[in-house]
From Swiss-Prot:
Pfam assignment, any one: Ribosomal_L23
Cited InterPro entries: Nucleotide-bd_a/b_plait_sf, Ribosomal_uL23-like, Ribosomal_uL23/eL15/eS24_sf
Protein name: Large ribosomal subunit protein uL23
GO biological process, one term: translation
SUPFAM superfamilies with a match to the protein in the record: Ribosomal proteins S24e, L23 and L15e
GO terms for cellular component: ribonucleoprotein complex; ribosome
Physiological role: One of the early assembly proteins it binds 23S rRNA. One of the proteins that surrounds the polypeptide exit tunnel on the outside of the ribosome. Forms the main docking site for trigger factor binding to the ribosome.
Similarity section: Belongs to the universal ribosomal protein uL23 family.
Keyword RNA-binding (UniProt): yes
Matches recorded under NCBIfam families: PRK05738.1-3, PRK05738.1-5, PRK05738.2-4
Organism the protein comes from: Dinoroseobacter shibae (strain DSM 16493 / NCIMB 14021 / DFL 12)
Length: 98
């Protein structure tokens, strides 16, 4: 597997919500990442894929809700989010392609 493919395994997709938009005003971008990825892997992937310098990475894991499907209880998957703060002067435009 190439290095670029490994970076795409770490970063799944950008998260575009009201909270993520407010964070982008402070120079942060929010991504959904692989549940087993760590902060150095996320930093390396963002720097390699987008060509920017990363200042800090904060992560959070949201536990999946229990829902019912046709009467039987099921569970949604856990989601890990990464709040990536960029160095001054660096930007990532995640809204292109929408």
């Amino acid at each position: 597997m190439t290095a670029k493919a490994q970076h795409y395994d770490v970063i799944r997709k950008p998260i575009i919500t009201e909270k993520a938009t407010l964070a982008s005003e402070n120079g942060a971008v929010v991504f959904e990442v692989a549940i087993d990825s760590n902060k150095p892997q996320i930093k390396e992937a963002v720097e390699a894929l987008f060509g920017v310098k990363v200042k800090a990475v904060n992560t959070t894991i949201t536990k999946g809700k229990t829902k019912r499907f046709r009467g039987t209880p099921g569970k949604r998957k856990d989601v890990k989010k990464a709040y990536v703060t960029l160095e001054e002067g660096n930007t990532i435009d995640v809204s292109t392609g929408l």
